[in-house]
Amino acid sequence: MKLTAKLKKAIMAHADECYPHECCGVIVEKQYIPCRNVSAQSDQFEIHPEDLAMAEDQGEILAYVHSHPDGTTRASELDLIQIELHQKPWVICSYPDLDFQVYEPCGYRAPLVGRNYIHHYQDCYALVRDFYDRELGIKLPDFERKDGWWEDKDHPSILIDNFPKAGFYEVDTPQYGDMLICRVPRTEHPNHCIIWLGDNAMLKSEDTEPCIGNTLILHQLHGRKSIREIYGPQWSTRTVKILRHRDVKNN
């Protein structure tokens, strides 16, 4: 996508208006449509649903736009994920050091081992979904979840309530690919899921360093990178369910 001088001027004006917060908007019919940013995070953006709906009524969205206050035009990891999810160009404007960069969908995907933590997009369940997709060829549904949901006793127990809907059933002994649900640490609801690798540490979808053991797991703790490690007492004592997907036997 080529940015015209008119588009750049409109985006710069919106970035200036929203500074020090991120501005956001969309490009429709070669026009920049500014939108409200309703994200609770100062370094992120979320387009107001009403603004997005109004923009879509005006025509096809050609690109999504946001600014990086006091930053560069380099796409963050979350930006790269969102570009692939939306399958649309992503325009980033740095401010006040004005610069523009357009990113096209390129097939980016975070590694299974060593990915950074981003709630919902790269958390423990997102890792399970990606593992099942890449390693087992199984598509798992996603579930809306806010950070810290497990601390609210009145909140639905997302992992426990939804595993049957995702095609899982309970078993007694884990085998390769099973999902284990854990409680970390003391919480109102079980809040962590891990993947049982057993003695099969190597992945088909990416190159990884050797990892030795016969009770290996793959998981991602809150705020940490995803890792493979031994399933020791620190995890066995926290495991509340061992789950197998109904389609695993066909893989």
Which ranges hold each PLM region?
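Conserved beta-strand-loop surface patch within small alpha/beta domains used
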Residues: 1-63, 69-107
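Glycine- and charge-enriched low-complexity intrinsically disordered segments
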Residues: 222-251
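Active-site nucleophilic cysteine motif
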Residues: 118-135
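N-terminal pre-domains immediately preceding structured catalytic cores
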Residues: 118-119, 123, 153, 190, ...
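Second-shell loop/turn segments in exported
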Residues: 112-118
